[in-house]
A protein has these predicted regions:
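C-terminal motif of bacterial Sec signal peptides marking the signal peptidase cleavage site
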Residues: 31-33
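Bacterial signal peptide processing site
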Residues: 35-38
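N-terminal substrate-binding region of glycoside hydrolase catalytic domains
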Residues: 47-170, 178-192
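Active-site groove signature of glycoside hydrolases
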Residues: 165-197, 221-231, 301-312, 336, ...
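Noncatalytic carbohydrate-binding groove/subsite architecture in carbohydrate-active enzymes
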Residues: 198-356
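Aromatic/acidic polysaccharide-binding cleft in carbohydrate-active enzymes
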Residues: 345, 349-407, 423
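Carbohydrate-binding surface patches
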Residues: 423-457
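C-terminal beta-strand-rich structural cap/linker in extracellular carbohydrate-active enzymes
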Residues: 468-498
């Protein structure tokens, strides 16, 4: 994907306010101790109040915005489906401590293979650079995750050495086409970052200098604040603005599948007092503080691309988009590197869950998010949860699910197309226009109120993931996503809607 580098270091009007919020919350975190937290793995919507997010330019020929993140240890199983996603983007996380476990002894073998395979697939690779904890940082980790025993990150002992490592990464992988580098991952979570928001700002500033020294065309990306933390950022903004009823509505829409999963951290909320208590929780205060620090980096131009993580119900997307339209500078692109479906013990069938994949992905894209990467491509049956907490597009062995077929149909429709939102006469969704042809992915906003579309010449229709067939008489669109394809603009296809 083409990316426009933004290196404007002028202070924006919101920067001073963000620094005040981050500093105040940082003090609260220090007073509270901030040493515990849960790992983020990745009602009606709030009416939009911010300015619309900028429209997206056409995707270059043979590229599209629907990517995924997968376990490279199962590359062979996933390969047939990955070929269908050619033209998309993905990311891979590395750490200084894993690449250079002993000072001066770097091993790039695994990452070289990933970069080479990504290039062969035609999938753009983004790299997340973490420190973790080892000789380069000192200290003893409190958290060990996975079979690789990944640890939290912290500040380097020698910042110049850290910058040399970051520069090594950029110089090595620029020839593979890597242009976007995220610094750390979900730093709002203690198991990913041991340090203050101020220390994180210092680290990213140093990393950005090294990235641009090695490749002036490269783009620095934030850590990707967690999905849960973004939810608390959404409601904190509304509460601070005195929009209490909207805050309660947004909270219950956003967290409807999380309520009760973390005890008092994400409680049932029906009063503003309960919501204020939740916001004051130590973990949730940390979430908001690190979101403010991230936005300071964006406002200052240190970070040129905002990375969003979203694992919630599609009812929460409008509130997130409203937040982003209000808080994100208009010249800073947004990409969702982690999009998924968190639903512990979810009871939805394969079709309804697949349709939700379509709705969440297209709503984000229609709202101005230019990349959507689904996580996981296929879940790990041996995960510590012992169940599929986040829904995969594929079975663990690579067998394509209905969700995978639907997601692929979005990639086909979007390849090389111009994206625009659809919001007309009870229909919502997204439109992809390529040349003289348009494909719309739409559904009715009301569960029990179908919308009727009069067919235009050449109109083909069908469910997402299914073969499209010529439309005969009037087309009925329910609350289940449907594809409409015909010659002409999106407006001409929807010229007669009832």
């Amino acid at each position: 994907m083409n990316t426009a580098t933004r290196l404007n270091t002028a202070t924006r009007p919101t920067t001073v306010a963000r620094r005040c919020v981050a500093a105040a919350l940082g003090v609260l975190l220090l007073l509270a101790g901030c040493t515990s937290g849960d790992e983020d793995t990745t009602p009606p919507p709030v009416p939009p109040t911010g300015a619309p997010l900028p429209s997206l330019p056409p995707y270059p020929e043979d590229t599209h915005p629907f990517g995924a993140h997968w376990d490279w240890n199962r590359y062979d199983e996933f390969l047939p489906y990955l070929r269908k996603l050619s033209g998309s983007a993905t990311y891979h996380e590395i750490s200084w401590c894993s690449i250079e476990p002993t000072a001066g002894q770097q091993d790039w073998t695994a990452l070289d293979q990933i970069a080479q395979r990504s290039r062969e697939l035609g999938i753009a690779l983004n790299i997340k650079i973490r420190t973790e904890m080892c000789w380069a940082t000192g200290g003893t980790p409190e958290y060990l995750r996975g079979t690789a025993n990944k640890t939290e990150s912290t500040m380097p002992l020698d910042m110049a050495a850290y910058q040399r490592f970051v520069g090594d990464v950029v110089r090595r992988y620029a020839p593979y086409g890597v242009r976007q580098y995220a610094i750390e991952n979900e730093v709002n979570a203690p198991q990913y970052w041991r340090g203050t928001p101020e220390e994180f700002v210092t680290l990213v500033t140093a990393a950005a200098e090294a990235v641009h020294a090695a490749d002036p065309t490269a783009v620095v990306v934030d850590s990707g604040i967690s999905s849960v933390a973004y939810g608390f950022g959404v409601v904190d903004r509304l509460v601070r603005a005195g929009r209490d009823d909207e805050a309660i509505t947004a909270y219950n829409a956003y967290f409807q599948r999380r309520i009760g999963t973390r005890g008092r951290k994400i409680p049932q909320v029906d009063t503003i007092e309960t919501l204020r208590t939740a916001l004051a929780d130590e973990t949730n205060s940390r979430n908001v503080a690190f979101l403010a620090a991230t936005e300071q980096l964006i406002d200052d131009g240190v970070v040129q691309l905002r990375q969003v993580h979203y694992y919630e119900h599609f009812d929460g997307v409008p509130a997130l988009l409203d937040y982003l339209s209000a808080e994100n500078p208009s010249d800073v692109p947004i990409e969702a590197w982690e999009v998924g479906q968190f639903w512990r013990d979810g009871d939805g069938d394969d079709t309804s869950r697949a349709e939700e994949v379509v709705k969440v992905s297209t709503m984000l894209l229609a709202g101005g998010v230019r990349q959507v990467m689904w996580l996981p491509l296929g879940y790990n049956p041996n995960n510590r949860a012992g169940s599929e907490v986040r829904y995969g597009l594929l079975e663990p062995d690579g067998t394509e699910r209905e969700a995978g077929r639907m997601f692929e149909s979005l990639a086909v429709a979007a390849r090389g197309a111009t994206v625009s939102p659809v919001d007309q006469d009870g229909l919502t969704g997204v439109a992809f226009q390529r040349g003289e042809e348009s494909t719309l992915v739409v559904w009715s906003t009301e569960v029990n109120d179908a919308v009727r579309v009069s067919p235009v010449p050449s109109l083909q229709t069908g469910a997402a993931g299914a073969d499209l067939a010529p439309a005969g008489a009037e087309v009925t669109v329910s609350d289940r996503p449907m594809l409409l394809r015909a010659a002409g603009s999106p407006g001409s296809i929807l010229a007669d809607v009832d």
